[in-house]
Curated annotation (Swiss-Prot):
GO terms for cellular component: plasma membrane. The gene is yajC. Belongs to the YajC family. Keywords: Cell inner membrane, Cell membrane, Membrane, Protein transport, Translocation, Transmembrane, Transmembrane helix, Transport. It comes from Treponema pallidum (strain Nichols). This is Sec translocon accessory complex subunit YajC.
Length: 135
């Protein structure tokens, strides 16, 4: 019989388990914790910040704000209700949409409007592309 095998037979099971698990130490749990922290910082935290910003934006919508819905419909808020908004999309058409359907407010986000940008800079000649956008 092999001498190592005879020693294993004489060792109590508890000692054998302690020998095999004692080599792991604290490094693997620490590594898992670091990976979880990095995952939280790069995935969950930015998403939570974006949700808070969007909720604040939707909460502060007022009459006259130019908005864009998640479906891409552009309009101006004409009536503000508790859970919905009525937006005017043209001279004759209005839509009632849920507050959660608003993707952005054009004024507050700094989205430029080519027509007003061109009008606000007198003396600057329009290029061919600018003329197409300004129409």
């Amino acid at each position: 019989m092999c001498p190592a095998r005879s020693r294993m037979k004489t060792m109590p099971h508890r000692t054998l388990l302690q020998i095999t698990t004692a080599n792991g130490g604290w490094i693997p749990p620490l590594a898992i914790g670091v990976v979880c922290l990095i995952f939280y910082l790069f995935v969950f935290a930015p998403n939570l910040r974006e949700q808070k910003r969007t909720q604040a934006l939707i909460k502060n919508i007022k009459k006259g704000d130019p908005v864009v819905t998640i479906g891409g419909i552009h309009g101006v808020v004409s009536v503000v209700r508790e859970h919905s908004l009525v937006i005017k999309v043209n001279e004759h058409g209005t839509l009632e949409v849920s507050r959660s359907a608003i993707a952005r407010i054009n004024d507050r986000r700094g989205v430029s409007n080519p027509k007003t940008d061109c009008d606000s800079k007198p003396g600057v000649p329009l290029t061919g592309v600018d003329k197409e956008i300004a129409r």
